[in-house]
Structures are given as structure tokens and as C-alpha cells.
């Protein structure tokens, strides 16, 4: 693992040089982007996250007060200014870093972090103020702490068919309660019980499997992170810790139909009070398989049936917003849009919707990411419209 990490850091160093050169010189036509101007009264129409030898773009977060954007590239975190200039990066992650969100209460960036082979799932907490240079190792610097999520482990490792064998990281099995493949989407927002108060919401990944009926919900866990400092531990991939809350503060279910790896990006919109869930589309013919679902923030969670379970089960059900496209046979509402690679609400009807891509650099394929400013229109099928420089 260590030799692999050293080789990866060396590759990322090359990527840093390439990305900086692209930003400085404009690069080739296939990937050149002019950084959008910023001002004291506005935000740019787009923020370029660079090009990297990494996994693909997973999520984005913005620190508006300091003028920083964060990009998760699966095994790499990149910090830029709002002109897209790299400020720093965090390497050394061999797990899967997913969606991100910025916590305005403590000024840190929270993300989902999976180690499926080790059956370990964490919230990764990055101290952005300490990310000051490129290629900072997550294991040997003080930029990252982690909190273990025991509830996710319980559902991920559940032996649903009772054969005494856990089948591992595969969707082709009856194992994994609710089809849980781990975690991905994360966002800060109100308590879904309707009692107020900011919570960190963590969404399950869910395997695509058209043969089972117990995987048709998005599963959301909520945590009060104000006392999480007592759980936080540095990342040690050679000795993964289990320090974290024994259970979530709430567990909620949204009936959408099965998707491919669950909620990729979760975002709370302070303007509408609704929650957005961007997903990779599912494959079940009995569902519409939309790319975006919206939770109705005006309706507190209610007790109801968690449909399709092996035995009757009841839990806290959250409602989809009755708007957009509607699939009458299933009763599911939703939209067709982007957001699967990054979604940031500015809480005033505007969003940064991320785009992912690749470029070739001397025979090496680099992953790219860009956050593009949109406004919410509510139109169907795509409720987002591109707009220019923000006010």
C-alpha cells in the first residue's frame, strides 16, 4: 500500500504541474478554460477544478467567505480559489472520497470516505485553513480527521439470506440491508423530523439490483456533529479506527425506486427548504429512473412502511416534492438533470452544478472537473438553467 501511495503521489505531482500549466497558458483547445472573473459583490459563472491523474470528480463544496472551492476526485481533494487557481491538495487516500459539503459552523469541509474491503465507512473532515500547498499527505499532515459510522457498517455487512456468509462488495447478492453499498452524498441542513437545528445528513450508496424489492429507498442518516471532536481520529489506513457515534440521531427513507449507487450528491437548499438528491439512474422498469429527486422540506418525516422488506418494517419516511415529472404507476416525482458530480446551493435560487470530463496529456488521461453556475427554474425535464456571473 505504501509503495502504491508513493507512486500515486509522484503521479499527482506531475498532474499538479500539468494543471498549473494549463491554467497559466490556456493549454490545448480540448481543455482550455478561461478562469471567470470574481469581484467583491459576485461569484464567477464557473470555477475550474483542474486536470488530475486521479479518480473522477465526485463532489464540490464552496467556502464563500474565504473565496475557496473544494473538489473531490475520488482519491484526491483539490482546493482552488474562485478563479480556479490551485491553492492546495490532499493526497494519500486509497479509499473512496465522495460528496463534500462545507460546514459554516466550524469552517471545515466534510466528505464521505469508504473502505469497502475493510468494511469501514467514515466522514472525512478537512481543515481547509491548513491546506496550503499541493500534495499534502492525508496520513502524515494534520489536515484530515475522520469519524467512523457504525450504522453504515451494520447495514453494509448484513447477512440478509442467513447463510452465514457475507458476500462482500457486490450488488449481485441478497446481502446488504436496503442494498447498502456504503455512503456517498453528504449535506448540512435541518433535522428531518421537523424539529429545527442543523444536522449532517449522510446518504447511503445503494447497489443496482433489479431482482430484489428491498432496495427501492434512498436511506439518509442524520447526525448532530457539535460533539464530534471527541470521536475524531487521524487517518491511518494500516489500522482503521472505529471511533464514532453508536447510532445516528435519525434514520430516514425516501421512496424513489432503486438507483445505481444511491445518492451521489446530496444538497440542502436554504431558499426553498428542500433537499436535492442527484443520482445515477436506476434500471428497474417499474420506476421512472430519474436523475434528480427533491425532498419536500415543508413536510416533516412521518412514520410509515419501508416498502419491499423481507419482513414488514416501519420507519421515518420523507416525502418527495410533488413537482417536476411524475410517474403515476409508482407515484414517484423527479427531474432529469446533472448534479451527480457536484451540486452546491447558494441558498438564493442559484446553484453550482459540476461537470466531469477527461483530457489527454502526453498519453496520460487526466480527470477534470468544473462547477458551473445555474439558476433553479423548476422547468421539466431539467430544472436548472445556466446563468452568467452571479450578482
Language-model region placement:
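Signature of short aromatic-glycine-proline-rich micro-motifs recurring in repeat-based ectodomains
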Residues: 54-59, 96-97, 116-118, 159-190, ...
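Beta-propeller domains
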Residues: 40, 50, 63-93, 245, ...
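Residue-level detector of Asp-centered blade-edge/turn motifs that repeat once per structural unit
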Residues: 62-66, 102-106, 190-196, 269-272, ...
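Surface-exposed loop and turn segments in beta-propeller and other repeat-based domains
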Residues: 37-50, 131-183, 225-260, 304-337, ...
Amino acid at each position: 500500500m505504501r509503495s502504491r501511495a508513493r507512486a500515486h503521489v509522484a503521479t499527482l505531482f506531475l498532474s499538479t504541474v500539468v494543471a498549473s500549466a494549463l491554467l497559466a497558458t490556456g493549454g490545448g483547445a480540448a481543455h482550455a478554460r478561461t478562469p471567470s472573473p470574481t469581484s467583491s459583490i459576485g461569484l464567477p459563472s464557473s470555477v475550474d477544478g483542474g486536470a488530475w491523474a486521479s479518480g473522477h470528480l465526485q463532489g464540490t463544496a464552496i467556502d464563500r467567505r474565504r473565496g475557496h472551492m473544494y473538489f473531490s476526485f475520488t482519491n484526491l481533494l483539490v482546493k482552488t480559489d474562485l478563479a480556479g487557481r490551485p491553492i492546495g491538495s490532499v493526497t494519500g487516500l486509497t479509499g473512496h472520497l465522495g460528496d463534500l459539503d462545507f460546514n459554516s459552523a466550524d469552517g471545515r469541509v466534510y466528505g464521505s470516505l469508504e473502505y469497502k474491503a475493510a468494511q469501514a465507512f467514515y466522514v472525512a473532515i478537512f481543515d481547509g485553513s491548513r491546506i496550503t500547498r499541493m500534495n499534502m499527505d492525508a496520513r502524515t499532515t494534520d489536515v484530515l480527521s475522520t469519524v467512523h459510522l457504525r450504522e453504515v457498517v451494520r447495514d453494509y455487512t448484513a447477512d440478509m439470506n442467513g447463510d452465514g456468509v457475507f458476500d462482500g462488495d457486490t450488488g449481485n447478492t441478497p446481502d446488504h440491508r436496503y442494498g447498502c453499498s456504503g455512503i456517498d452524498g453528504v449535506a448540512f441542513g435541518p433535522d428531518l423530523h421537523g424539529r429545527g437545528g442543523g444536522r449532517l445528513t449522510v446518504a447511503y450508496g445503494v447497489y443496482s439490483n433489479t431482482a430484489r424489492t428491498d432496495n427501492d429507498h434512498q436511506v439518509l442518516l442524520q447526525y448532530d456533529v457539535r460533539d464530534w471532536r471527541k470521536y475524531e481520529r487521524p487517518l491511518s489506513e494500516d489500522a482503521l479506527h472505529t471511533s464514532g457515534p453508536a447510532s445516528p440521531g435519525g434514520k430516514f427513507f425516501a421512496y424513489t425506486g432503486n438507483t445505481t449507487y444511491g445518492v451521489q450528491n446530496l444538497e440542502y437548499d436554504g431558499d426553498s427548504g428542500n433537499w436535492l438528491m442527484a443520482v445515477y439512474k436506476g434500471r428497474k422498469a417499474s420506476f421512472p429512473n430519474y436523475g434528480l429527486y427533491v425532498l419536500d422540506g415543508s413536510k416533516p418525516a412521518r412514520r410509515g412502511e419501508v416498502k419491499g422488506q423481507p419482513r414488514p418494517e416501519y420507519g421515518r419516511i420523507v416525502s418527495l416534492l410533488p413537482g417536476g415529472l411524475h410517474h403515476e404507476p409508482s407515484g414517484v416525482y423527479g427531474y432529469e438533470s446533472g448534479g451527480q458530480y457536484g451540486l452546491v446551493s447558494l441558498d438564493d435560487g442559484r446553484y453550482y452544478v459540476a461537470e466531469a470530463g477527461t483530457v489527454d496529456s502526453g498519453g496520460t488521461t487526466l480527470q477534470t472537473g468544473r462547477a458551473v453556475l445555474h439558476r433553479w427554474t423548476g422547468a421539466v425535464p431539467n430544472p436548472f438553467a445556466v446563468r452568467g456571473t452571479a450578482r
